Amino acid sequence: ASKTFTTTETMRNAASALAWLEEGGVADPYGRLIAVTAAPERAVEFGIDETRVLPFAESVGARYSLWSCIGLPAALALGVDAFEELLEGAAAMDEHFREAPVAANVPVLAAVADLFYAQRGVQTQAIFAYDERLRLLPSYLQQLVMESNGKSVTAEGQPLQRPSSSILWGGTGTDAQHAVFQLLHQGTHLVPVEFVAVAEGDDEQDPAHHRDLLLNCFAQGAALMAGRPAEDPARAYPGNRPSTTILLD
């Protein structure tokens, strides 16, 4: 998959895959490939039959392409039913964004909060997924946010009169707690935090593991808000640190 069908690492992977198939004695290695691209003519020139090329529009940015045929690997790995649920969820959020009043419009409120922090000099935001199934979410959101809003000019090419995207970073659950949370609770930087958790775990052997994860997640948000005094300044938490907790069904 490559939007332009010229991406260096993608083409190198394709060449390696073809070589592997040929070494394995496959008579028609190109017939085992499927191309997903906004430049179908280049895929055909490469040697892939046009019936095995899945095109998508040039206007679809890479960071938004998951919901196009670029999502083929997800559909193959998770099943078409799961992929259709993903599409339905995206459509539901699109409708919410278009129809919900401003005071209850989640994307609008999130954008206003981001702008509020940026205009007050906050340069980073953190997101922590309290479920191993969401371990790649922070990396995905890094591309979604910083590639979308990381330029210093507007869509019309004019210099931006406000801060561009904040720097998004994060990690997974309790691993991050033992690595970076001291800075979030006690440091001099103000870092808005988003916690994402899942109501139901997938550990059928011992549900207590997931319960502990949720307790940790909720406790971190509460501690950021309330803080904790201590005689030893090194152990005190000032509180009044912003965070949002999102609990998925």
Task: Please report, for each region that a protein language model flagged, where it lies by residue.
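A SIS-like phosphosugar-recognition module
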Residues: 1-249
